[in-house]
């Protein structure tokens, strides 16, 4: 019985302390890149959100994740899912052409194209991403 109590206390402490020593993606990325390479903040966040990867790729899987987050957090209506996916796919292709390769600037271009205030409203996007960002905990940047 005392072992079970000890185990419950240990798990409770872990769940309580975990978020206290963790950071959300936006804060972590700002701490990591604000002084050295601000253009990489977007890539860092999108990588932690799983909207891209370490190699700056934007695959269908990444586009689907981005779309699902926007719909779940009410930035766009679910009935427009296929339109959003097509829009993001077009933005991924355009961002690669504009930046002549895979780099942090590609994700800045992708973001700028995606949040066009036509299909994806800036303020709804910000609200959705902020909600999603607060739901994710990452190890704090220790650089």
UniProtKB/Swiss-Prot annotation:
InterPro entries documented for this protein: PBP_GOBP_sf (IPR036728)
GO terms, molecular function: odorant binding; toxin activity
Subcellular localization: Secreted
Tissue note: Salivary gland.
GO biological process, any: suppression of blood coagulation in another organism
Signal peptide, first to last residue: 1-22
Keywords annotated in UniProt: Blood coagulation cascade inhibiting toxin, Hemostasis impairing toxin, Secreted, Signal, Toxin
GO terms for cellular component: extracellular region
Function noted in UniProt: Inhibits the intrinsic blood coagulation pathway in the host by blocking activation of host coagulation factor XII (F12).
Quaternary organization: Interacts with human F12 (inactive).
Record protein name field: Ayaconin
Species of origin: Lutzomyia ayacuchensis (Sand fly)
